[in-house]
Each structure stands twice: as C-alpha cells, then as structure tokens.
Amino acid sequence: MQDGDDAVGFYAKYVLPRIIDLAMRNEETARLRAGWIPQARGEVLEVGIGSGLNLPFYSSDVQRVHGVDPSLELQRIARKRAMAGLIEVDFLSQSAEEQLPLADASIDTVVITWALCSIPNAPRALQQMKRVLKESGRLIFLEHGRAPDPGIAVWQDRITPLWKRIGGGCHLNRKIDDLITAAGFRITDLKTYYLPGPRPMTYTVPGSRGDDWSACRDLAASMSGSGRSVSSLNASTNDWVHC
C-alpha cells in the first residue's frame, strides 16, 4: 500500500504538473489568453498561476502580479517564465481558499484561468478574490465547465469522478458563471462555446466583470469563419448578444 501511495504522490507532485503545462500550451488557449489577459491593469492577483502561461500576455499597464498556486513544481516552471519577462511577480505558495496575504480592496485585477474547476472549495476562494478586489476592479476568467446540452452534461457527470483523480481535482461539471455570481460578482461580459476536442472537456466559459467589450469584439474577429458561435451576456440589460 505504501508503494501505491508513493506512486500517487509522485504522479501528483511531479508528473501531473508537467502534463498540465503541456496540455495548456496550445493554439486555442493562447488565442483566448491573447484576447483577455492584456485587459489586466495595475496590481494583479492571478489565482492558479500554474506554470505562468499567462505571463507573456500581460501588458505594461500591469505593475505587479501576485501569483497564487499550491503546486511548487508548477511554480518552479512559472519562475523561469517570470525571469524572462519584465513584470514583477510575487509568488504565493498556498491554496486559493486560504486567507490571502493581501489587504482588502488592494487589487485592481483578478485573473483566474482554468483553475476554478480544480479548487476544492471554489466559493471560499471566490470570496477571497472579492475581498481583495477593488470596487472598481476587474475580474477576468477563462474557464471550462458544465455544458448546457443535456447529453453532454450527463457525460460530464459520469466522467468527473475519474477525471478528478487523474486531473488534479478537475471538475468537468461545475457551473462556472453560477459560482461567480453566487460570490457577489456581477458578470458584465460572458461568452460560451466549445473548443475543438471532446465536448465534455471543452465547453469554455470566458468572461469578466467590467465594461470593456474589446475582448468580445477581438475574439469574434479571430474566430470569423471558424463555424463556431460566440455568445455574450450583457449583464446590465440581461440580454444575450452575439459579438
């Protein structure tokens, strides 16, 4: 039993971080990062900074990034990427649910990408994000979650118990926008669509709290002719629009 536990621990500590870094380095995720991450401004909290794949996409409007992640191996990779950039990065080796060592209303932008799926207590983590984010601040999220299509959602429910075990706690069936709004955030820009690949794993939910619609326009332009629809929610009017 000890050998089995050691193997699981080795996989989670050393192998899985490498798999995550490789899996998240592709054309589709890079396009999403390029459309959203440059919107970040000022003092940034990135929850689930992982291997630092967002770092090259931050603009010069960012003063500093506070990167939270419990994985020391992913953080080691991220530190190398941070050294190659010009933005100051303060790494916080902890879970997002824990009390963040940041003052209330001290952050201009919170960024979370493909991380809400795997945080054990996502509501508690979102409350921490809300605590540190300024009233006028922006929340930027790029996530995957529960599909609206019943046939796909059924498979997400079936696959998730095993998927969590091999994917570092990743849930395929979390309702991302519901989690965010339940934490008290007002989503002003929300898009939903499937990326290429198996649909239970690729239902994508990017969005933000803020009033800048440039990402919506840029994303629509970049996907023109792809045959995929991009839907957006204007939360101020509660209307779905296609951008």
Predicted feature locations:
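Conserved alpha-helix/loop element of class I SAM-dependent methyltransferases that forms part
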Residues: 23-43, 53-57
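Class I SAM-dependent methyltransferase SAM/SAH-binding core
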Residues: 45-47, 51-99
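A short acidic, Gly/Pro-enriched loop at the edge of an enzyme's catalytic core
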Residues: 97-109
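A short SAM/SAH-binding and catalytic strip from SAM-dependent methyltransferases
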Residues: 108-121
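A short glycine-rich, Lys/Arg-flanked "PGG" loop and its adjoining helix->strand segment in the class I
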Residues: 123-135
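Conserved beta-strand signature within the Rossmann-like core of class I S-adenosyl-L-methionine
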Residues: 136-144
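Short alpha-helix
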Residues: 168-184
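Conserved S-adenosyl-L-methionine
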Residues: 185-196
